[in-house]
Design a protein with these regions (language model features):
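Active-site metal-binding motif and surrounding structural segment of the metallo-beta-lactamase
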Residues: 43, 54-91
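FMN-binding flavodoxin-like domain, especially the glycine-rich phosphate-binding loop
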Residues: 152-192, 196-199, 219, 241-256, ...
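Conserved beta-strand hairpin/beta-sheet module of binuclear metal-dependent hydrolase folds
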Residues: 3-63, 131-134, 138-142, 235
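Active-site neighborhood of phospho(di)ester-bond hydrolases with catalytic His/Asp-centered motifs
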Residues: 48-50, 72-80, 89-91, 140-144, ...
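Short, charged N-terminal beta->alpha structural module
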Residues: 227-249
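Short acidic active-site motifs
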Residues: 87, 262-266
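Metallo-beta-lactamase
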Residues: 4-8, 89-129, 173-179
Length: 364
């Protein structure tokens, strides 16, 4: 068990899954993930959520170690996604079915010295989600909110993997997150205990501010993401020329090769930066599939409030810009640059003026 200290009477009993390669069977997690669970020891004992079925034995070992022959009185179920609910079926509380309590907004559970206040958080990011505020030690048990990828045994900066987690897991539900943040703003919070990632104790305003920015679909950084989907490398060559020009102008720029790089990280950067340039090759009368996949993901996650430039490549009938524009148009508050670039198979000197005009426009 990770040596995570919360308090004398609130214990961490979660587990790391350092060997997991894909979270939700789609998101690369090179440093694994943690499944967090907590135990409140008081006159009444409460277990806060279970963990994924991959870690059943380890979790029960952690639980038994802290219980020391005591028997839990309550199991709090904040979120029914299987990575947190898989072990409810094995949790032996006598007469559990008859003792199920459906709680409502603002209701409290008296454990003795500790009191849990229940706060509903529907669609953050599942319909049934709730969070709990422990009034004595002023701890917010935030369910998947404020979570991040990465096992706790792997020490790393919070923001990058928390951002990638947020925009790919929770990002579609900005409005419900805003509602939860408003509720949380009325509480005196000293610690945040999520179901994934580290316990947050210091400088909580930093983490809350990030969630305010992310959930309101503001751009976290002024800058440009250049995203390329190139078949034979020629479209990528042009995209990298654009990257160089932007850097020469002092613009903060990120580049992603959609054919090779982590798509979830590309989605993260698309939301992070204020502007984006898409460089896509024409394919089968449309746009090359990695770009199409990327734009579908942005549609589903609520991409909005951005400026986007378009670059296409096509040998006979370039159509990528039209397809990309058609996919962007339904998105909310997207400004598409008037200047576009069309490459016929390979870059030629005559293309440079159009590239320069697009870069100038995206910079202003």
């Amino acid at each position: 068990m990770n040596n995570v200290i919360i308090s004398d009477s609130i214990k961490y009993i979660g587990v790391d899954d350092a060997t997991l390669d894909l979270f939700e069977s789609q998101y690369i997690v090179p440093n694994g993930v943690s499944y967090n669970s907590y135990l409140i020891l008081d006159e009444k004992i409460a277990v806060m959520d279970t963990v994924d079925a991959r870690k059943t034995k380890e979790w029960f070992d952690n639980l038994d170690k802290e219980l020391k022959e005591h028997v839990p009185d309550y199991l709090i179920v904040s979120h029914l996604e299987p990575d947190h609910s898989a072990n409810i079926q094995f949790f032996n509380i006598e007469g559990l079915d008859e003792r199920c309590i459906v709680v409502k907004e603002g209701e409290e559970l008296d454990l003795g010295n500790h009191h849990l206040k229940f706060i509903m958080a529907p669609m953050v990011h599942w319909p049934e989600v709730m969070v709990e505020y422990e009034t004595t030690e002023k701890i917010l048990f935030s369910a998947d909110g404020f979570g991040k990828f990465g096992a706790l045994s792997h020490d790393e900066d919070w923001a990058c993997e928390a951002r990638r987690y947020y925009f790919n897991i929770v990002g579609k539900y900005g409005a419900p997150v805003q509602t939860l943040l408003k509720k949380a703003s009325t509480l005196d919070i000293k610690m945040i205990c999520p179901l994934h990632g580290p316990i947050l104790k210091d400088n909580l305003g930093y983490y809350i501010d990030k969630y305010q920015i992310w959930s309101s679909y503001q751009s976290e950084d002024e800058g440009v993401l250049v995203a390329s989907a190139s078949i034979h490398g020629n479209t990528k060559e042009v995209a990298l020329k654009v990257v160089d020009l932007l850097k020469e102008k002092g613009v903060k720029v990120a580049f992603t090769d959609l054919t090779r790089d982590d798509m979830a990280e590309a989605v993260e950067d698309a939301f992070r930066y204020s502007k984006m340039i898409l460089a896509g090759a024409t394919y089968d009368g449309g746009v090359f599939s990695p770009m199409e996949d990327f734009l579908h993901r942005l549609q589903h996650k609520g991409y909005q409030n951005k400026t986007v430039g378009l670059i296409e490549n096509g040998s006979w009938a370039p159509l990528a810009n039209k397809v990309m524009k058609d996919m962007l148009t339904p998105m909310k508050n997207i400004t598409i640059c008037e200047n576009t670039v069309t490459i016929k198979s390979t870059y030629k000197d005559e293309n440079q003026e159009a590239i320069n005009q697009l870069v100038e426009e995206i910079c202003h």
